[in-house]
Structure formats: structure tokens, C-alpha cells
Amino acid sequence: MHGEPPEVRRFPSFAEEVAWVANWAKGLGAEMSEACLVTRTQAVLDRFAEALNAAGVATYRVRRNEAEDRVAPGLRLATMHRVKGLTFGRIAIADANRGILPLEASLAEAADPASRREAEHRERRLLFVAATRARREVNVLVSGDPSPLLPAVVGP
């Protein structure tokens, strides 16, 4: 990323997080298709897609095993795994909440402390990769307890 440092934005509820994303996306105008909303899981992405579409925001899913149509209109929606290797003008990493980042299920599968540390490192790298997909702007959105991994992308 070559722009400003990541901006952490905290919201009291999911609805207010969605409202911020909707306003942000609409404010981008013609550049909306150069921005991407990134989530840790497909389930969270589905929840945002439904809420954004209800708010009148055009969206475009960047799907696994499919090339992105760069001329299709709409805010890009993708999981952290899917954005590897891609770049966008702007990124909003949504739902960067404890339990989602790191993904609690991923940590629960660890059989011992060493495996848990490795799972935490994988999650931290995934967040870092997502944050570095932006050329100009990264927003990290929280609507709950913040992820303990946030210092990995925004500093202490």
C-alpha cells in the first residue's frame, strides 16, 4: 500500500457498520468498482452483500476460481483468501472483530500450543495480505470487540 496508514473505524452495531460501508461506496461514485469490501468468511460476506444490496449499493462478487470482470459495475466483495494476488484502489476489511479474526474455529482445531501459535500466525498473515491489497486506502471496520490481530496492520 502506498497511501495513508490503515484507519480503524469502530461501530456500535453491524447495522451502523453497513451504513458506513454503503455511504463510503456511494461516495466513490464511478470509482466504486475499484474498491473492495473484504471479510474473513463467506458467511460474513453474504451478510454484508444482502445488507448492502438492500441499501441500494451495487455489488460484484469476486469469486473463487473465476476471473474478475474489471468493467462490471459495483463494489467488489471478496473473502480474505480470494483477494490474494489482486489489487484495488481501496479496501475495507469488515467485521474485524474478536472471534472472527482470528477465526475462533481455526484456533479451536489446534491440538497443542504450538499448533495454536501457527494458526494465529496464519490468521495474522491473512489479515496482512488483505490489508496490502490496497493501493491508496485501507479501512478496518469493527462492530464488536476488536480483533487482537489489529496491531498487525495498524501498529501498536
Give the ranges of each region predicted by the language model.
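Helicase P-loop NTPase motor core
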Residues: 1-61, 66-70
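Short, glycine/charged-enriched secondary-structure capping and boundary segments
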Residues: 50-54, 106-108, 153-155
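Conserved helicase C-terminal RecA-like lobe
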Residues: 31-34, 78-143, 149-151
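Positions that flank functional sites
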Residues: 67, 145-146
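Conserved motor-coupling elements within RecA-like helicase/translocase cores
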Residues: 65-76, 80-84
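Short, charged/polar "capping" segments at the starts of alpha-helices
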Residues: 44-47, 146-150
